[in-house]
């Protein structure tokens, strides 16, 4: 019965153009990767799909640091953090992260997690008890959505970036604990939350602002300190989750917050307590990553990334203006996430396939990840891309647009 049901559902997904496929990368994360899929021969593709925003995932210094960490601490941690798996590498990384966020969160402490998904589940389920209300942007990342649903708190969602709706919800709320929860940079649209106004609402209504800075950490703000720094925010009411497998180039995540919040997570957050700690070697490598992000090389990489973003937006705007019949729309984003919205699932899949045929890897994103009718190519840029890479992408999109238009009846 189960297998019959699942096979029926899988066929339904395939008919709707919603089937997901995994590809196998046979080389390190980089703009050019060797990739295979479903037994097909491997090919070299120009990729615009990773979250390696600063191009650090294969940086020689991080590769060396990871190997050094393995020599120092072995391959694995062997236990959860609260048994025997919490190493000096984890503790040192948490101290570094706390210092990193201290200009924005006074007296901050930090807690390291294996993944961003686990960090968000831990944070919202631990703080979102029956005496709390969670106010969540409707376009928040799936991990924030799931964390809010699993929490015992009352959940209220507000239309994307609608501060007026949020203010009314807060004004009507009488629970003692109020958590405003938002992405800083929204993962599928690339736009940035109005964090200063959200913090003002938190202060006005005695709430706390939980910020998922997965796509801002390392890229935005002074020395890449993230979205809180980008806006010049400083408040004990801020709780920041950041991921360390995107701009930081390695893996894991952290929560930085008031010391009492961090202690509460250690005591009660089930996704932290009941899982084996990440390998200490990863934490060791991440300390080197922070040094790179906050140094001169980090500044240079952020400058390169911003130049590529400006180039791509300018050249895509020209392309869209020249071929209006395609119905493409470039989302309003100033970040490394540049969504090209094409509409239907079929159109997005066809465009991704046309680019693949030209040797470019740009994934089609479809519902339920994005709202129905807004299927898109999620173009992501890295500081490791070149201006020629961006030009090649735009030229390939122009050719694909012509080919697809000519193929229509």
Curated annotation (Swiss-Prot):
Modified residues (N6-(pyridoxal phosphate)lysine): 246
Organism name: Polaromonas naphthalenivorans (strain CJ2)
Family, as annotated: Belongs to the class-II pyridoxal-phosphate-dependent aminotransferase family. BioF subfamily.
Pathway(s) served: Cofactor biosynthesis; biotin biosynthesis
Recorded superkingdom: Bacteria
Enzyme class: transferase
Quaternary structure (record): Homodimer.
InterPro entries linked: Aminotransferase_I/II_large, AON_synthase_class-II, AONS_Archaea/Proteobacteria, AONS_Proteobacteria, PyrdxlP-dep_Trfase, PyrdxlP-dep_Trfase_major, PyrdxlP-dep_Trfase_small
Keywords, sorted A to Z: Biotin biosynthesis, Pyridoxal phosphate, Transferase
Family annotation (PANTHER family): 8-AMINO-7-OXONONANOATE SYNTHASE, CLASS II AMINOTRANSFERASE/8-AMINO-7-OXONONANOATE SYNTHASE
Task performed by this protein: Catalyzes the decarboxylative condensation of pimeloyl-[acyl-carrier protein] and L-alanine to produce 8-amino-7-oxononanoate (AON), [acyl-carrier protein], and carbon dioxide.
Gene3D superfamilies recorded: Aspartate Aminotransferase, domain 1 (3.90.1150.10), Type I PLP-dependent aspartate aminotransferase-like (Major domain) (3.40.640.10)
UniProt KW Glycosyltransferase keyword: no
One Pfam family here: Aminotran_1_2
Claim: Coiled coil is one of the keywords in the record: no
Requisite cofactors: pyridoxal 5'-phosphate
Transmembrane spans: none
Residues reported to bind pyridoxal 5'-phosphate: 116-117, 187, 215, 243
Binding site for substrate: 20, 141, 369
Name the record gives this protein: 8-amino-7-oxononanoate synthase
Reaction catalysed by this enzyme: 6-carboxyhexanoyl-[ACP] + L-alanine + H(+) = (8S)-8-amino-7-oxononanoate + holo-[ACP] + CO2
Example of a GO biological process term: biotin biosynthetic process
Catalytic activity, EC: 2.3.1.47
UniProt GO molecular function: 8-amino-7-oxononanoate synthase activity; pyridoxal phosphate binding
């Amino acid at each position: 019965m189960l297998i019959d049901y699942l096979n029926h559902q899988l066929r339904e997904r395939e008919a709707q153009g919603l089937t997901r496929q995994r590809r196998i990368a046979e080389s390190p994360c980089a703009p050019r990767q060797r990739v295979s899929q479903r037994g097909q021969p491997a090919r070299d593709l120009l990729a615009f799909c990773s979250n390696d925003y600063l191009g650090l995932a294969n940086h020689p210094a991080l590769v060396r640091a990871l190997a050094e960490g393995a020599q120092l601490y072995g391959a694995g941690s062997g236990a959860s953090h609260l048994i025997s798996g919490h190493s000096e590498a984890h503790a040192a990384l948490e101290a570094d992260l706390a210092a990193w966020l201290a200009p924005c969160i006074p007296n901050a402490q930090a807690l390291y997690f294996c993944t961003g998904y686990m960090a968000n589940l831990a944070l919202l389920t631990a703080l979102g008890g029956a005496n709390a209300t969670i106010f969540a942007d409707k376009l928040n990342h799936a991990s924030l959505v799931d964390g809010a649903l699993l929490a015992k708190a009352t959940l209220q969602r507000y239309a994307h970036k609608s501060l007026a709706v949020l203010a009314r919800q807060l004004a009507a709320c009488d629970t003692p604990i109020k958590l405003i929860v938002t992405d800083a940079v929204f993962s599928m649209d690339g736009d940035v939350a109005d964090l200063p106004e959200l913090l003002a609402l938190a202060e006005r209504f005695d709430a706390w602002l939980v910020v998922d800075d997965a796509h801002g950490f390392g890229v935005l703000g002074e020395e890449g300190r993230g979205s809180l720094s980008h806006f010049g925010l400083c408040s004990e009411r801020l709780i920041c989750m950041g991921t360390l497998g995107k701009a930081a180039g390695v893996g894991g995540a952290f929560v930085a917050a008031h010391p009492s919040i961090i202690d509460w997570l250690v005591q009660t957050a089930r996704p932290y307590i009941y899982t084996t700690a990440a390998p200490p070697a990863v934490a060791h490598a991440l300390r080197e990553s922070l040094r790179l992000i906050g140094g001169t090389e980090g500044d240079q990489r952020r400058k390169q990334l911003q130049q590529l973003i400006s180039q791509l937006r300018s050249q895509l705007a020209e392309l869209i203006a020249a071929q209006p019949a395609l119905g493409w729309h470039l989302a309003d984003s100033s970040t490394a996430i540049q969504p090209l919205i094409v509409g239907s699932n079929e159109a997005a899949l066809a465009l991704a396939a046309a680019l693949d045929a030209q040797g470019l890897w740009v994934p089609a994103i479809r519902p339920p990840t994005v709202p129905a009718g807004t299927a898109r190519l999620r173009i992501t840029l890295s500081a490791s891309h070149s201006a020629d890479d961006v030009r090649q992408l735009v030229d390939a999109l122009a050719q694909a647009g012509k080919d697809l238009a000519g193929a229509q009846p």
